[in-house]
Amino acid sequence: MSDITTLSLTALRDKLARKELSAVEAASACLARIEATEPKIHALLHCDAEAALAAAKALDAAGPNPDQRLWGVPVLVKDAICVKDAPTTCGSKILENFTPFYDASCIEKMRAAGAVILGKANMDEFAMGSSTENSAYKVTANPWDLGKVPGGSSGGSAAAVAAGQCFAALGTDTGGSIRQPAAFCGTVGIKPTYGRVSRYGLVAYGSSLDQIGPLTRTADDAAAVLGVIAGPDPKDSTCAPRDVPDFEAALAGAADLAGLTIGLPDEYWGEGVDAEVRDACRAAVDTAKSLGANVVPVSLPHTPYAVATYYIVAMAEASSNLARFDGVRYGYRAPEAQSLEELYELSRSKGFGPEVQRRIVIGAYVLSAGYYDAYYRKAAQVRRLIRQDFLNAFEKCDVICGPTSPFAAFTIGQMSDDPLQMYLSDIFTISLNLAGLPGLSMPVGLGTTSAMPIGMQLFGRAFDEATILRTAKVLGNALPPLPQPAAV
C-alpha cells in the first residue's frame, strides 16, 4: 500500500494544505490503489478516473483553500446516492442504465468543500441486506479476509476505506448499514441523528429511517466529513433546521473522558454475543474507565422487539417507495412485455432481486386492509416505546455503549439461504434508527478466534454527535491501532 493511502484524512489534508502533496498526487495514489485491490475485493460499481483527475487538476490550478475543508481529498460514494452524470444503480438491475442529472445535496456540499469524487461503491440491492451479497452486479469481499463479507448494506464503502481506495466514503444507514460494515472492516462509521443530513438525492428505502453518513479511518476524519455534509436543506422537509456545530473543534485537544458517564445496557451484553466480541468490547470499556469515564448499568427493555418492529416498518416503507420502479419512466424495461400489465409484472420481477421482492411483498401485506392494525400500527407503537427506552437511559448517562454486531464478519454464503438469521445480525443497530438517534461504530481490536475486526457502538442523544465523536477519538487513541488489512 502506498504511504499516501495509509494516511488518515486529516493527515492528508494537512499535507495538501502545506503543498507537500498535490490533489493530483492524492487522487493518483487512490486510483493506483483501486487498480491494485479492486480485482480482489470488488468494492466499486463505477470509477471515473478521468473525471477525478480533471477535478484534482482544477483544484491544484486554483491552489489550496482553507475554506474548503475537504480540499483535494479523494472520496467514494455509496451507489444509492445520486451523483450527476455517474451511474446510480442502487446495486439493482432495475436501475442498471440510470444516470442522474443532478447531485444529491450531500454531494453538492462535498464538491463545494473541495472533495474529489472517485466513483460509486457497491451495496446490497436498494440497501436491503447485511453482507453486500445482494448486489445484482458483484459480491464485495472483506479486505481482512477475502472469504468473508464486508457487512452491508454499505459494504463497498467500508471495504474501500479499509483497503485504502479512498480517504472517506459516504454510506447510508437504515438499520445499521453504516455501522455494521464499519465494524466488520475495522473502520469508523457514524449514523447521524435523523434529520442532521439531507436525504435529497438519496434513493429511498425506509424514508423515516434512512440517514447518510461517513465511513472513515478515524473519529477525527468522520468529524471532518460530517461537518461538511450536515445542515439544513430546503429541498428535504425532514432535514432539521438546526445549526451544525463545529465537530472538529469539539474534538480538538480531547485527551481523557473525565466527567463522561457511559451506560451499558444489559440487553446488549448477554447471551448471543460471541465471546471474542464481548471480550474486546469489555476491554475497551475498561480502557474508558481508565481514561476517567464513569460506567453505569442502564436498560433498554424493548430491545427484544426491535427486529420485528424494524422489519415491519422498513418493509412497509420499502413497498411504498419502490412502487415507482415500474419500467415506464426509467430503469429496466422488460422487452418481451406485450401489455401494460405485463410491462409492470415482468420489469419488476426481472429487475428486482429475490431479497427486494421478499421485502416488497411483506411490506404490501402489512399495509393491506385487515392487517394494517395487526402489524404496522402495533409496530409504530412499539417504535415509540423503543425511543422512550433511550430517553429514559440518557437520564442516567451521556453515551450508551455495546457491541455493534453479535459476531465478527462471517463467511461469504454462510447466511445467504437463511434470511431470518441475516436479519438478526442487525439486532444491536436497528433500535437506533427506530429512535432516530446518532450512533457510531469504532474498531476496538481483532477477534481472538476470527482474527477479524471487532466493532463497538456508541449511542448519543439527539443531535449530540459531538459527544460520541469525542468519546471515539479519545478511546481510539488509547487503544492499540489495527494493522493494515493483510488480504490486500
From Swiss-Prot:
EC class (word): ligase
PROSITE patterns found in the cross-reference section: AMIDASES
GO BP of this protein: translation
Signal peptide: none
E.C. code: 6.3.5.7
Classification via InterPro entries: Amidase (IPR000120), Amidase_CS (IPR020556), Amidase_dom (IPR023631), AS_sf (IPR036928), GatA (IPR004412)
Active site: 78 (charge relay system), 153 (charge relay system), 177 (acyl-ester intermediate)
Swiss-Prot/TrEMBL catalytic activity: L-glutamyl-tRNA(Gln) + L-glutamine + ATP + H2O = L-glutaminyl-tRNA(Gln) + L-glutamate + ADP + phosphate + H(+)
UniProt GO cellular component terms: glutamyl-tRNA(Gln) amidotransferase complex
Keyword terms: ATP-binding, Ligase, Nucleotide-binding, Protein biosynthesis
One of the record's GO molecular function terms: glutaminyl-tRNA synthase (glutamine-hydrolyzing) activity
Function: Allows the formation of correctly charged Gln-tRNA(Gln) through the transamidation of misacylated Glu-tRNA(Gln) in organisms which lack glutaminyl-tRNA synthetase. The reaction takes place in the presence of glutamine and ATP through an activated gamma-phospho-Glu-tRNA(Gln).
PANTHER family: GLUTAMYL-TRNA(GLN) AMIDOTRANSFERASE SUBUNIT A, TRANSAMIDASE
Family, similarity comment: Belongs to the amidase family. GatA subfamily.
UniProt name for this protein: Glutamyl-tRNA(Gln) amidotransferase subunit A
